[in-house]
């Protein structure tokens, strides 16, 4: 009989393991290679295996990123949420094991009971004082988890904890990218500001020259007004760049979370900001294991499926066990002795019979949440694929834009120099010189913006490929 009981309990335990759906990663249509990706270059490196201090070479940028990871308020919230989720998981996991308590009591009581003739003379009651001492170790309402309810609660809490850890890593990676992109935008704006300041000075000189020529009668009012208009345009653009620089600097201070060091390290030129070897795109399937946001979405799906097991277990009886063992005696001396030993044990069963569809509705909610988690996982994967594809396309076509714009700037610089020479020779008028200089200024500004976009795109590629997530170093 005991053997049959053990077999039955084992069968129930195995059945309990089947209440939660088996976790399987949703299948998504993927391609072998990202669209528009170039062939891997010799010496290319895997982004997920490069720590951010190795990828970003500028010492000032590294200082800013390190400060942001320490002081950024959103980062601090993400870290605290990890601690919260860890605590919740420990609470749930502790419910899988019995809670053992120690009870000790000493009771002294007086009782009045009906007595005999002598007692009647004293009022009909006889009294006595009694003492009772006890010490017991017991287990209170330990649930025998035949159906896996407590185990699935623990599994769901564990998955939520792991999802929170990955969400914190995803935010950390995003913060690194935001700080780097903002810093590079500031450095680019500083270069554009210097170019704009130089252009404004040149435009002011041209206005003075045009005024002298106008007063001397060798230039027209059209030439003078054209010079003034170009000066106004340059000054307007200078103000726009200053506004952009101020906003980007304010945003960087917000990201860093504190006042930056008053004496930061010397920065590197923009063309030496990043690691020189090209980043390898890798296979799309590898992204599932390197992007923390994808891993977090899968853990949330795992938690949703564990909660289905919890909801299904509610249809079965909950069996709890309460027991204790110890000693009890009317005298304190000799309390812990064999003749004073006591024990008790007893199971309890709880099963709601009528709940007006509450358990069925709870199961429906759990299944709906699983479907939501599947959709969110698929959406996260698709968004990640798109981010990588966009960054790869940007790497390819921004390089083409940069090469063409550099050639355009060289051509326009030659035109501006020739216009100056031919103006000195009297072949062209001053308006043609101004037009050549304006075209060169616009082209140089565009070149700086393309270089900035190229750097920001490389940062986006590093982030979208899960940069540093498998490096195993402190980030």
Language-model-derived ranges and their functions:
Residues 220, 259, 428-429:
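Short coil/turn motifs that cap or connect alpha-helices
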Residues 2-70, 118-120, 158, 242-289, ...:
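Terminal intrinsically disordered/low-complexity segments used for targeting and assembly
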Residues 99-101, 221, 251, 318-320, ...:
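Residues at or immediately flanking beta-strands
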Residues 215-244, 446:
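Repeat-solenoid scaffold signature
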Residues 71-72, 216, 425:
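Charged, alpha-helical scaffolding/interaction elements associated with membrane systems
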Residues 90-91, 111-114, 236-239, 261-262:
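Secretory-pathway/luminal and periplasmic proteins that interact with or process carbohydrate-rich
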Residues 78-92, 171, 175-198, 202-212, ...:
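Amphipathic alpha-helical coiled-coil segments
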Residues 19-26, 50-51, 57-66, 71, ...:
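Small/polar-residue-enriched beta-strand and adjacent coil segments characteristic
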């Amino acid at each position: 009989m005991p053997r049959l009981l053990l077999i039955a309990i084992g069968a129930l335990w195995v059945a309990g393991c089947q209440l939660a759906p088996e976790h399987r990663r949703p299948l998504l249509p993927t391609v072998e290679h990202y669209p528009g990706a170039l062939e891997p270059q010799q010496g290319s490196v895997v982004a997920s295996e490069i720590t951010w201090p190795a990828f970003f070479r500028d010492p000032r940028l590294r200082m800013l990123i390190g400060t942001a990871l320490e002081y950024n308020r959103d980062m601090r919230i993400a870290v605290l949420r990890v601690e919260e989720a860890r605590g919740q998981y420990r609470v749930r996991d502790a419910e899988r094991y019995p809670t053992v308590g120690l009870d000790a009591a000493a009771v002294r009581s007086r009782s009045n009971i009906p007595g005999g003739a002598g007692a009647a003379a004293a009022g009909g009651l006889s009294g006595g004082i009694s003492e009772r001492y006890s010490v017991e170790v017991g287990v209170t309402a330990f649930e025998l988890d035949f159906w896996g309810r407590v185990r699935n609660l623990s599994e769901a809490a564990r998955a939520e904890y792991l999802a929170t850890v990955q969400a914190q890593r995803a935010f950390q990676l995003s913060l690194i990218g935001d700080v780097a992109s903002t810093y590079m935008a500031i450095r680019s704006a500083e270069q554009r500001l210097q170019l704009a300041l130089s252009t404004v000075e040149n435009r002011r000189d041209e206005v003075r020259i045009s005024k002298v020529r106008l007063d001397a009668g060798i230039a027209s009012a059209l030439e003078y007004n054209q010079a003034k208009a170009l000066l106004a345009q340059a000054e307007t653009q200078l103000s726009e760049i200053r506004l952009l620089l101020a906003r980007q600097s304010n945003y960087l201070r917000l990201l860093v979370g504190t006042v930056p060091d008053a004496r930061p390290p010397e920065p590197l030129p923009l063309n030496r900001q990043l690691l020189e070897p090209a980043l390898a795109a890798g296979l799309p399937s590898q992204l599932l294991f390197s992007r923390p946001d994808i891993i977090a979405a899968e853990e949330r799906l795992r938690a949703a499926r564990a909660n289905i097991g919890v909801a299904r277990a509610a249809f079965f009886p909950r069996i709890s066990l309460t027991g204790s063992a110890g000693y009890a005696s009317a005298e304190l001396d000799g309390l812990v002795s064999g003749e004073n030993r006591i024990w008790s044990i007893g199971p309890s069963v709880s099963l709601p019979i009528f709940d007006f569809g509450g358990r069925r509705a709870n199961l429906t909610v759990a299944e709906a949440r699983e479907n939501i988690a599947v959709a969110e996982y698929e959406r996260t994967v698709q968004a990640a694929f798109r981010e990588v594809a966009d960054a790869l396309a940007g790497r390819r076509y921004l390089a083409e834009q940069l090469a063409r714009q550099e050639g355009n700037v060289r051509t326009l610089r030659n035109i501006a120099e020739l216009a100056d020479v031919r103006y000195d020779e009297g072949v062209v008028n001053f308006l043609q010189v101004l037009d050549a200089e304006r075209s060169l200024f616009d082209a140089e500004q565009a070149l700086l913006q393309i270089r900035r976009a190229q750097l920001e795109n490389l940062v986006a590629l590093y982030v979208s490929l899960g940069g540093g997530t498998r490096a195993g170093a402190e980030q």
